[in-house]
């Protein structure tokens, strides 16, 4: 008997609770790619990534599905780790440089892109503060994805609070951006068959 969509959704939730989560091209990361300016032939595999830190009692974590038009950089050293490939598929092109080659409107831009993430903390914040944390977390996207927030991307971040710990909003927002940068890096580094070493 074939499972209906509702049954599949329920089964997916049950499996998620069993500790089956993996970074890389699994779950929401299945089918994710990066560096898609010239279409699927020259892009690289990506996936879903996560990372969390604890400072004292404060916990901040991020999870992100990285399916971006742009290239991915290691936020710690600025080195490109995934993205638009040259025709020989042995080296990278720079998506930003390729975009700068012409200011004319590109009608057939590869538009099936979105990087969607969430940042979660055990600190207590209300809705307006969580919106600010989500906004600050976009700095993690900017450190790691270039270009980011284009009209061909649907980039978004959601912030959630699960606790009652009192913490400084600016500290948590700044830390959230760093945690998100690492989650993005882990998404591409964990994807199977994704990386070339240059």
List where the protein language model places each region.
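Internal helix-turn-beta structural module
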Residues: 149-150, 155-195
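Hydrophobic alpha-helical bundle architecture
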Residues: 103-111, 117-152, 165-174
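Glycine-rich, charged/polar anion/phosphate-binding loops
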Residues: 44-55, 59, 97-107, 142-145
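Stable alpha-helical structural segments in soluble proteins, enriched in small hydrophobic residues
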Residues: 8-20, 133, 144, 176-183, ...
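Glycine- and Gly-Pro-enriched alpha-helical subdomains that act as flexible
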Residues: 63-113, 117-125, 166
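Phosphate/diphosphate-binding glycine-rich loops and adjacent basic-rich segments that engage nucleotide
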Residues: 8-75
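Short, small-residue-biased leader/transition segments that mark boundaries at the very start
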Residues: 1-5, 198
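Flexible, glycine/charged-enriched surface loops at secondary-structure junctions
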Residues: 20-26, 106, 143-156, 191-195
């Amino acid at each position: 008997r074939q499972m209906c969509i509702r049954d599949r959704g329920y089964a997916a939730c049950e499996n998620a609770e069993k500790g089956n989560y993996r970074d890389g091209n699994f779950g929401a990361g299945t089918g994710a790619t990066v560096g898609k300016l010239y279409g699927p032939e020259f892009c690289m595999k990506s996936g879903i990534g996560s990372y969390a830190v604890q400072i004292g009692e404060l916990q901040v974590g991020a999870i992100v599905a990285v399916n971006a038009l742009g290239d991915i950089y290691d936020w710690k050293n600025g080195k490109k780790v995934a993205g638009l490939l040259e025709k020989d598929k042995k080296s990278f092109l720079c998506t930003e440089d390729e975009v700068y080659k012409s200011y004319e409107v590109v009608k057939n831009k590869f538009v099936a892109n979105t990087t969607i993430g969430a940042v979660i903390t055990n600190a207590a914040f209300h809705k307006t503060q969580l919106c600010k944390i989500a906004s600050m977390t976009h700095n993690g996207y900017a450190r790691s994805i270039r270009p980011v927030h284009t009209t061909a991307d649907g980039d978004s971040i959601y912030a959630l609070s699960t606790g009652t710990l009192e913490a400084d909003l600016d500290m948590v927002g700044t830390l959230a951006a760093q945690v998100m940068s690492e989650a993005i890096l882990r998404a591409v580094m964990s994807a199977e068959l994704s990386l070339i070493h240059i």
